[in-house]
Amino acid sequence: LVGAASWHDVLSHILSTQGFNTIMLSLKTSIAVVVLTLIVGFPVAYILALKQFRGKAVLDTLIDLPIVMPPLVTGLCLLLLLNPSNPFGRLLQQWGIELLFSPYGIVLAQFFVASPFFIKTARESIAAIPSNLLSASATLKASDFYTFRNVILPLCRKGASTGLAMTWARALGEFGATAMVAGNIPGKTETMTIAIYMEAMSGGLNRSISTALVLVLFSFTLLFILKIQAGRQYEY
């Protein structure tokens, strides 16, 4: 990729209106997915790791399913669910909620595909916490929220940070489900991955390479920073 296009072409494409809008849309949606994953994912990971309830195995399997299921299939399921011909999609339409072929649809598709990486990693990190620490907190009559905030969260920070980095990178690189749910509307739903595909198929190989380089650079930089902050050791 580095030697496939001149830096002049790369910079020209990045600074163009289309290239800039594509990059900004991808960053905004992937960051929104990270925030949504934190809000939803931590409680789910906590429940799966420490609570016992009927249907736990089913919920656990459903959460892990998008990891192994083709993104196109995930996107197709969401497309059918949100379609106005479906009762749920019709209800959303009556409420004025537009998800299909919109940036919100991008966030939804990326969330379903990427959030399991965080939930799975956070769940395993929480489950690895020594039970005597949790028992001590319970003996002191600490609430579940206090235990989560002051015992669980600090101890699973490294694993959660890694999972969050994986989620962000997966959301940023998502293509199949996004294309099914949001389509390709330039300036509205054209993410970097969709732009890479469309440019390559239409003969704009240099523009496709330029966008791919930006995607690789963003992914490498953020993953590197997050893992260093998590205290991981790396070979340089």
State each model region's role:
Residues 137:
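The alpha-helix within a helix-turn-helix
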Residues 9-10:
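Hydrophobic transmembrane alpha-helix segments characteristic of membrane transport
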Residues 232-236:
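Short, Lys/Arg-enriched, Gly/Pro-containing loop segments at transmembrane-helix junctions
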Residues 54, 142-144:
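Short coil/turn motifs that cap or connect alpha-helices
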Residues 129-133:
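Short glycine/proline-centered loop/turn elements that form peptide/ligand docking sites
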